[in-house]
Amino acid sequence: MERQEKANNAGHMVDVVVIGGGISGLSAAKLLNEYGINVLVLEARDRVGGRTYTVRNENVDYVDVGGAYVGPTQNRILRLSKELGLETYKVNVNECLVQYVKGKSYPFRGAFPPVWNPIAYLDYNNLWRTMDDMGKKIPADAPWESPHAEEWDKMTMKDLIDKICWTKTAKRFASLFVNINVTSEPHEVSALWFLWYVKQCGGTTRIFSVTNGGQERKFVGGSGQVSERIMHLLGDRVKLRCPVTYVDQSGDNIIVETLNHELYECQYVISAIPPTLTAKIHFRPELPSERNQLIQRLPMGAIIKCMMYYKEAFWKKKNYCGCMIIEDEEAPISITLDDTKPDGSLPAIMGFILARKADRLAKVHKEVRKRKICELYAKVLGSQEASHPVHYEEKNWCEEQYSGGCYTAYFPPGIMTQYGRVIRQPVGRIFFAGTETATQWSGYMEGAVEAGERAAREILNALGKVSKKDIWLREPESEDVPAFEITRTFWERNLPSVTGLLKIIGFSTSVTALWLAVYKFRLLTRS
């Protein structure tokens, strides 16, 4: 009776309702609209963009306080943004990057800081090589089907790091690598999931690099424009301040209800929100047990994104580009990038407070965070000019109730093999998008576009408008942002690990001892 009453009161009938007005949901809606499908996007916030958010004010002009970076091999977001009339610019790494470790700053160039200790170098080299080799054994579209899935999914990344690395230097940087890439701790995440995550982003070098990597570029005017321009195209088919609370697909049409009791009827639904947020929605019939269990087991990463503005880019006077990799437990920030505008105006440094540090520093006042960051930059860059910013912007994604955190949801140990296969499995006429469901650059804007367009094509296939083989389409490489192959040198490919070196030394010692024993024996027998 209740369903019939809701159906009678539903004032809007559409073909598809998309839950979530981030890049993924809007990409889905845009594609459906191009096929003549009557689509409606319901967004909980008073803005579109989801985990991308461009703030505009007189102090910053514009600033991305959420997802911002694009680069080679991220061909879908590059194609979509170009279609929407957006341009990219390169993040500055013309000068030296800085590694800060044990209270000292070391300038360097390249993706990773150099290591001068030969044993630590072997350890580092083996870490990246082993992670990439393990990733090659994981299918991007079905990591749970990896030959080692069960074994690796029972391990945390801390377990794996402890297993691979011998030196404290390598272990410390490997932990930072996890913090930076997935905004969570090594002991929290499944080794299988993290290895898959790095693999589907192109490997350890591609995911971590600025040049030829995931952080090479930003959008002129901000990444929020992607969603804003799609909303402009869709017009009144995007509704803000409409959190969805109820989805009933027990009848011929699906009934969708929002928090303010607006009712909509449709044939299909796309859920384009983080998996854990679907727990805020009441479903009828109830979700299948595996899906219900999955959404309770995928926490979000923790991050506070901080932008410090200065009168001038003083770091360039020291031949620094603004990128800092900071290995210090007491430091609030773990990594920074230059966030100066492409025309050189509004000099700024963007820094991430990550994982355990985000949790700790979220408890203090904004001004305390600002002071701690300024003190840190002054130490790392060796300049008191860092202590005198002209403006500070930040965004604590941990307090966003309609995101739950950033960048992405992560899989704790055991979850990928037990429940992972249902991540994008439709439930009746409900299909799932969101960057977490992507198979390339999941966690990035690229993954959001892939997932949204794939979910849209699943519905188009159900409607008989595209064939099943066209649900998953290969994206041509961007002509504007070409990707260059990442290769390893002969030594990077062939140097032994520390364990391998010890075995070589042990074998050599044994052979030498045996030779000496034989030599002495011969001398004795001759005499």
Curated annotation (Swiss-Prot):
What InterPro entries does this protein's entry cite?
Amino_oxidase, FAD/NAD-bd_sf, Flavin_amine_oxidase, Flavin_MAO
Entries under SUPFAM superfamilies matching the protein: FAD-linked reductases, C-terminal domain, FAD/NAD(P)-binding domain
Q: How does it sit in the membrane?
A: Single-pass type IV membrane protein
The EC number(s) this enzyme carries = 1.4.3.21, 1.4.3.4
Region Interaction with membrane phospholipid headgroups, annotated ranges? 520-522
Q: Which GO terms describe its biological process?
A: catecholamine metabolic process
Modification N-acetylmethionine occurs at: 1
* Site (Important for catalytic activity): residue numbering on this chain: 374
Where mainly located? mitochondrion
Kindly report every residue range on the membrane side named Mitochondrial intermembrane.
519-527
Topological domains, Cytoplasmic: 1-497
| Cofactor(s) it depends on | FAD
A GO-annotated cellular component = mitochondrial outer membrane
Q: Which reaction does it catalyse?
A: a secondary aliphatic amine + O2 + H2O = a primary amine + an aldehyde + H2O2; a primary methyl amine + O2 + H2O = an aldehyde + H2O2 + NH4(+); (R)-adrenaline + O2 + H2O = (R)-3,4-dihydroxymandelaldehyde + methylamine + H2O2; dopamine + O2 + H2O = 3,4-dihydroxyphenylacetaldehyde + H2O2 + NH4(+)
Where Phosphoserine occurs along the chain?
383
Q: Transmembrane stretches, by residue range? A: 498-518
Q: How does it assemble?
A: Monomer, homo- or heterodimer (containing two subunits of similar size). Each subunit contains a covalently bound flavin. Enzymatically active as monomer.
Q: Which family does it belong to?
A: Belongs to the flavin monoamine oxidase family.
Protein name according to UniProt = Amine oxidase [flavin-containing] A
List the source organism.
Answer: Sus scrofa
